[in-house]
Design a protein with these regions (language model features):
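Charged, low-complexity intrinsically disordered segments
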Residues: 1-152
Length: 152
C-alpha cells in the first residue's frame, strides 16, 4: 500500500513553508520559506526586506496579500516556489535527510484553510507544494547518487 503524508505538522512539520528555518534566496536571508515566497511577489528590495523582517511566517503571508504583485507573478510563481524550497533543503542537510527519509511517500499539503492551489482541502486541490517537495526529493536523491558514483 502506498504511503501518504497528508499533513505537514508534527513529525513532518519541516515540510511546511511555515517551518522556521532560515533560507537565503537572491541574497537575502529569510526566517522561513514562507517569508521568501511572499517577498518574491515583488521586485522592490525594500519591500522584500520588510517582508523578511516579519515576526512570523503568518505575518509574512499577510503582508504578501497586501503588496502589488510583480507583473509576471502568475507565470513565475511555481518556479520560484521550486527554487526557494530547493534552497531550503540544500542549505539544511538535516532537513534534506528528513525529506529523503520520506522515501516514496506521496506528499500532500493537506489543509483546512481552503488552499487548493498549493495543497488539498477536503479532497480538492492541485497540491503544488506537495508536488514541488517530491520534485526536490527526487533531485536530492539524484545528487546523492551522483556523489556516491563520483566517490566510489
Amino acid at each position: 500500500m502506498e504511503k501518504v503524508i497528508d499533513c505537514f505538522d508534527g513529525e513532518y512539520a519541516f515540510l511546511s513553508n511555515f517551518y522556521e528555518r532560515p533560507v537565503e534566496w537572491e541574497g537575502i536571508v529569510y526566517p522561513s520559506t514562507e517569508h521568501a515566497f511572499q517577498a518574491a511577489k515583488v521586485i522592490n528590495p525594500a519591500t522584500r526586506l520588510r517582508i523578511a523582517a516579519a515576526e512570523t511566517p503568518g505575518q509574512a503571508k499577510r503582508m504578501g496579500r497586501t503588496v502589488q504583485l510583480r507583473g509576471d507573478w502568475e507565470q513565475v510563481k511555481f518556479n520560484i516556489m521550486l527554487d526557494i524550497v530547493l534552497a531550503k533543503f540544500h542549505q539544511h542537510k538535516d532537513l534534506a535527510e528528513a525529506l529523503l527519509n520520506t522515501g516514496d511517500a506521496t506528499l500532500i499539503e493537506g489543509n483546512t484553510w481552503h488552499d487548493t492551489t498549493w495543497g488539498v482541502c477536503n479532497g480538492v486541490g492541485t497540491n503544488w507544494l506537495g508536488k514541488i517537495l517530491m520534485i526536490v526529493r527526487a533531485q536530492l536523491e539524484l545528487e546523492a547518487q551522483l556523489e556516491n558514483d563520483i566517490n566510489s
